[in-house]
Amino acid sequence: MAAAVAAAGAGEPLSPEELVPKAEAEKAEEDLEEDDDDELDETLSERLWGLTEMFPERVRSAAGATFDLSLFVAQKMYRFSRAALWIGTTSFMILVLPVVFETEKLQMEQQQQLQQRQILLGPNTGLSGGMPGALPPLPGKI
């Protein structure tokens, strides 16, 4: 402490360690640790509820109304998306899938006819794309 008085008289600034004696600094740290333990007893919801008191009632009610509105809109959009997905899926299955199946069936039938022609008339008839029932092309003129 005498060093602090001598330094103050010389016009030099004092450091915080020089101002607070060692025993008091240790007590202050223990008090802070005890205060931290007291603060840990609060739950998160209690702390958040306590923070609402620093905002005016008008701001709190506006925030609550905004939250309620956003929740309502989210619920409506969820219900709409479910209904739209159901309508789209069933419409696709009723209107589009039969057409897809029929075109695939037609392609398979054409492929089978082409294979039968190749088996009956020879391997070059499938590639030439001649008229069905026509004579095969001459071997020298391809």
Curated annotation (Swiss-Prot):
Region (C-tail signal): 123-142
Residue span of region Disordered: 1-40
Lipid bilayer topology: Single-pass membrane protein
Residue ranges of the TM segments: 83-103
GO CC field: membrane; mitochondrial outer membrane translocase complex
Documented effect of changing residue 42 to Q: Inhibits localization to the mitochondrion outer membrane
Annotated GO biological process: positive regulation of apoptotic process; protein insertion into mitochondrial membrane; protein insertion into mitochondrial outer membrane; protein targeting to mitochondrion
UniProt effect for mutating residue 49 to P: Inhibits localization to the mitochondrion outer membrane
Import sequence: annotated segments: 41-50
Modified residues (Phosphoserine): 15, 45
Subcellular location: Mitochondrion outer membrane
Molecular function (Gene Ontology), one example: mitochondrion targeting sequence binding
InterPro entries: Tom22
Side Mitochondrial intermembrane, residues: 104-142
Skewed-composition ranges (Low complexity): 1-11
Key words, A-Z: Acetylation, Membrane, Mitochondrion, Mitochondrion outer membrane, Phosphoprotein, Protein transport, Receptor, Translocation, Transmembrane, Transmembrane helix, Transport
Function: Central receptor component of the translocase of the outer membrane of mitochondria (TOM complex) responsible for the recognition and translocation of cytosolically synthesized mitochondrial preproteins. Together with the peripheral receptor TOM20 functions as the transit peptide receptor and facilitates the movement of preproteins into the translocation pore. Required for the translocation across the mitochondrial outer membrane of cytochrome P450 monooxygenases.
Family that this chain belongs to: Belongs to the Tom22 family.
UniProt free text on domains: The N-terminal domain (residues 1-60) is important for binding to the unfolded mature imported proteins. Residues (47-69) of the cytoplasmic domain interacts with TOMM20 while the C-terminal segment (residues 61-80) binds presequence of preproteins. Requires the transmembrane domain (TMD), a short segment (the import sequence) in the cytoplasmic domain localizing separately from the TMD and the C-tail signal in the C-terminal domain for efficient targeting and integration into the TOM complex.
Protein name per Swiss-Prot or TrEMBL: Mitochondrial import receptor subunit TOM22 homolog
Classification of source organism: Eukaryota, Metazoa, Chordata, Craniata, Vertebrata
Record gene name: Tomm22
